[in-house]
Amino acid sequence: MASGEHSPGSGAARRPLHSAQAVDVASASNFRAFELLHLHLDLRAEFGPPGPGAGSRGLSGTAVLDLRCLEPEGAAELRLDSHPCLEVTAAALRRERPGSEEPPAEPVSFYTQPFSHYGQALCVSFPQPCRAAERLQVLLTYRVGEGPGVCWLAPEQTAGKKKPFVYTQGQAVLNRAFFPCFDTPAVKYKYSALIEVPDGFTAVMSASTWEKRGPNKFFFQMCQPIPSYLIALAIGDLVSAEVGPRSRVWAEPCLIDAAKEEYNGVIEEFLATGEKLFGPYVWGRYDLLFMPPSFPFGGMENPCLTFVTPCLLAGDRSLADVIIHEISHSWFGNLVTNANWGEFWLNEGFTMYAQRRISTILFGAAYTCLEAATGRALLRQHMDITGEENPLNKLRVKIEPGVDPDDTYNETPYEKGFCFVSYLAHLVGDQDQFDSFLKAYVHEFKFRSILADDFLDFYLEYFPELKKKRVDIIPGFEFDRWLNTPGWPPYLPDLSPGDSLMKPAEELAQLWAAEELDMKAIEAVAISPWKTYQLVYFLDKILQKSPLPPGNVKKLGDTYPSISNARNAELRLRWGQIVLKNDHQEDFWKVKEFLHNQGKQKYTLPLYHAMMGGSEVAQTLAKETFASTASQLHSNVVNYVQQIVAPKGS
């Protein structure tokens, strides 16, 4: 349903929201002046050389916006978010005329206005102002080539190395460089698209329906309203395989068998557990697209079609639970959304909590607490580096005009957000009751965008006895302090159920750090039943104790080939870091191979830091590896690695 149209049974007289008054300093648009009922994209993709000029790679076509004027006084222009890389060549306006079936679209004037380094305003002028509640249609003809929202990959950046690939990444404010829009999470709308591709290519989108129309055209429709940042497109040499009653995997042909094997049958279990906890899964399908190895992120929760790194193909299903995080966004983030990027914790803190609830049910409390302990360690690391008092270490971040919301991204909304949701559950004191509350919260605010105030008002209404106790102003734990004071969370959930997994890992790491190895004691510990996060925890402890006494790392690798020869990316990263910290040169080739196989930022940068902080041989390895892999990395990652390998001024 478009924003403003409410389905029966979803609290028909819906509460007024604090978010209705909220500003979004990251949008140049006049999104409060219009309701966006529908967007249609009709685009043709061309794979040519990069750069301007005839025949260069690009997407070209039209964007059609169906709008209703919300201004009581009417409006004389529409202002949209756009970007200098988006070349708009024509604008037309179609207005309702009494008795006319479909009035013709008439050309209208338009101009751009500077806004910030990440976008500009596109202003469409109406010859006569539109009236309050009037419906109108704006048609924009445009082309986009090189830019931050549309990522073009050469064949060598893909897994198959044969054909080029293109994908879009919208979060947080990049879709204004893909199509002109209200680029704010405050606005939700339905969309459709018709995408024309060259021979031998397939298009996929974050949409509820995917339909082939002729040999080279694909039609998509999203039946639920979503914010602009969740519209996503990918075009490449793609095939699919069913892995569940409402799920399929998409990948390049050379990856499809591995993807099917890894995810066959498991996604449905995650979805069904989420539905039991948080209510119906409203998006119809849940498909996964395995991106080319140069995709710099772990996952992006585009509805109906999550984009994920091929690093999740571990060969032993050990990283399948990473998908639980993206699935949890189906309720928290995609269904109930932060109204601006300063409230990002509403998307991510709740998603971390939901992920860990699903994980507790499927894998047990000990395992989930161990995973949460690794998350807490990341938060500690982040706060140690930035300083606790850094204003980014608040849940409610004040984003100043001109600041790209992406530049405020860090662990705080995830892990401090998780702690706040855990604290609210702790106040309730009963897990079943809090689960029921979360289901009610999703139902209350589905398809809407909210602020923390909307959520907290609802929480205190739902639990009147807590409201009566004034739990919002308990000294040291005030809701206001949680939101607006930087620093370490005032409350930490108890992770002691994880001790049964953490203690043995710590004790084993201690044995391996000894000058004289006690192989009898070491061999008495069977690590074959350990799950991934227990091994990760063990390797993190080894890394902290490194460099180990001479010969110990070689012996460690020989004793546990399942670690030193792992296919699992989380283990490969840590084994690489250990090898470099201990200058264990006979395994340096494994570091090089891992960096040749993938380009995920989270794995790539720490290994370059470790190489440049290591021996001369390690530093040479860094320079050689970068020289031979730079062409297959994402441009942002190239810039970051460049700064590590050859810092400016060195």
Swiss-Prot record:
The modification N6-acetyllysine is found at residue 446. GO terms for cellular component: extracellular exosome; extracellular region; extracellular space; plasma membrane. Its main location: secreted. The keyword Kinase does not apply. GO terms for molecular function: aminopeptidase activity; epoxide hydrolase activity; metalloaminopeptidase activity; metalloexopeptidase activity; zinc ion binding. It catalyses: Release of N-terminal Arg and Lys from oligopeptides when P1' is not Pro. Also acts on arylamides of Arg and Lys. Its cofactor is Zn(2+). It is found in: Secreted. Zn(2+) binds at residues 325, 329, 348. Binds 1 zinc ion per subunit. The modification Phosphoserine is found at residue 7. Substrate binds at residues 298-302. The modification N-acetylalanine is found at residue 2. The keyword Zinc applies. Disulfide bonds: none annotated. This is Aminopeptidase B. The gene is RNPEP.
